[in-house]
Amino acid sequence: MNRVAVVVLGDIGRSPRMQYHSMSLSKLENTKVTLIGYRESEPHPQIVNNDSITIEPLKPFPISMSNSFKKIPLISIFMWPLLAICKVLFQIIQLMYVLLVKVPSPLNTILVQSPPAIPTIFVMQIVCWIRGVHLVIDWHNLGYTLLKLSLSKSDNHPIIRLAKFIERYFAKNAYAHLFVTNEMKIQLVRDWNLKGKTFVFHDKASPIFKSLTDREQEEFLKTFINKYSIKGEDKVYIESVISKKSIRNPKQQTSIIISSTSWTQDEDFSILLDAIVKYDIEHAINNNNNKVEEAQDESVVLAENLLFIITGKGPQKEYYQEKINSLSLKKSRIITVWLDSEDYPKLLACCDLGVSLHNSSSGIDLPMKVVDMFGCCLPVLAIDFKCIGELVKVNYNGFLFKDSDQLHQLLNQLFTHPTNNNTITNTNNNKNLILEKMRKNLTKDRETDTWESNWLTIKPLFIPSSSSSSSSSSSSSSSSSSSSSSNSKSKKD
């Protein structure tokens, strides 16, 4: 019997990469998986209904760190550090109990997501020492950089320096390390002197993320309206999209743009909101002018109606929801919704474009949401930062922007069309040419560059070996994996 514990100190349902790892591990011969994390939202049915996967839910800390004493700042100054210590101790005790008592023997490997790094990596090292098992760290980002962002502190602040030391010291002796970007691997191996095997393992979409036929899209959008109680103008916009699936070039087109956000500081939603307002103001005015021009000139510019669907949960959602509600939009609508896990891939497949506002705290991670969008062959507009070029290739599968002005320009480029006698003219600015070309590129990549094909490179890490030759073979796989990632990147470039 081979048993792997997959640990994420976060919501399992909102941790797609760790769910995909669990699914892949469950397919290994004679292997059982114990998935440990918070069960705040329901994991995918392929996790819940899998006989080879057992979920061990963690209990959240009973006091909210973000809301406690918010209205009493003076008390917050003294109580927040005490609460933070209590929360870490609560997590340590719970993780130790689950991994030392509830997870049965034999346990061969622990695969842990980082961040959060504290207390996760520290606890995992202790458990691995006690139980004599391998630790594999799946690096999504750097924990201390997220802490620095949330506390608005500098690198030299004592808390940030301590967090960085703990993360580096307890991580460096892990059996193996997985990195979401090549830049992350280079930086951590060089600066933190990591000892274990290293693999660049770019995020890949699960098979549940795929394209849908026009008919399947129509059926899902009708279900979406009823299931999520979409009413009023929002419903009218979606019904217009449904009509577009069967009627080519209607006089007034509507497109769906989706953005999945955590509503946190490293995803500045105001950039998208400002771009929407600029697009709306510009084309609401132009729409009135066009009515006059149509009587004098048969050639005018048609701006599509845009329906923005924003998914996700997070601390700033209420703040931006109030801003959205105060807007009086003419050419656009904004819906905020929290989707069931099985509905999210289907909605992505129904959209015309995705937007990513993820701006990395470390500069060396990549947004999983873009990977999922690409899985559904959905082109993406992404905010520009250091490593995003490892994922988004300009003019191939998306575009990059730095601010709301550039995002507004891209929306104009993709969703405004010259018309002649109220019929859209095929020009290079036509969305039907630009986005369709990108969809074809993504479809081609999707056929070969899959989660399953990439996961084969790290598979040896989770198969028990009793000889040094097996270990040597795994090291060889590590080298070939890294070169494979580089070759794959070169081909895409």
From Swiss-Prot:
Gene Ontology biological process terms from the UniProt entry: dolichol-linked oligosaccharide biosynthetic process; protein glycosylation
Keywords: Endoplasmic reticulum, Glycosyltransferase, Membrane, Signal-anchor, Transferase, Transmembrane, Transmembrane helix
Disulfide-bonded cysteines: none
GO MF terms, alphabetically ordered: chitobiosyldiphosphodolichol beta-mannosyltransferase activity; mannosyltransferase activity
Presence of keyword Disulfide bond: no
UniProt keyword Plastid, yes or no: no
Entry superkingdom: Eukaryota
E.C. numbers: 2.4.1.142
Gene3D superfamilies: Glycogen Phosphorylase B (3.40.50.2000)
Residues in the Cytoplasmic compartment per record: 93-109, 131-493
Entry's family note: Belongs to the glycosyltransferase group 1 family. Glycosyltransferase 33 subfamily.
Protein name: Chitobiosyldiphosphodolichol beta-mannosyltransferase
Record field: catalytic activity: an N,N'-diacetylchitobiosyl-diphospho-di-trans,poly-cis-dolichol + GDP-alpha-D-mannose = a beta-D-Man-(1->4)-beta-D-GlcNAc-(1->4)-alpha-D-GlcNAc-diphospho-di-trans,poly-cis-dolichol + GDP + H(+)
Sequence ranges on the Lumenal membrane side: 1-71
Lineage: Eukaryota, Amoebozoa, Evosea, Eumycetozoa, Dictyostelia
Pathway recorded for this protein: Protein modification; protein glycosylation
Cellular component aspect of the GO annotation: cytoplasmic side of endoplasmic reticulum membrane; endoplasmic reticulum; lipid droplet
Annotated stretches, region: Disordered: 462-493
Pfam families: Glycos_transf_1
InterPro entries with a match to the protein in the record: ALG1-like, Glyco_trans_1
Biased composition (Low complexity): 465-493
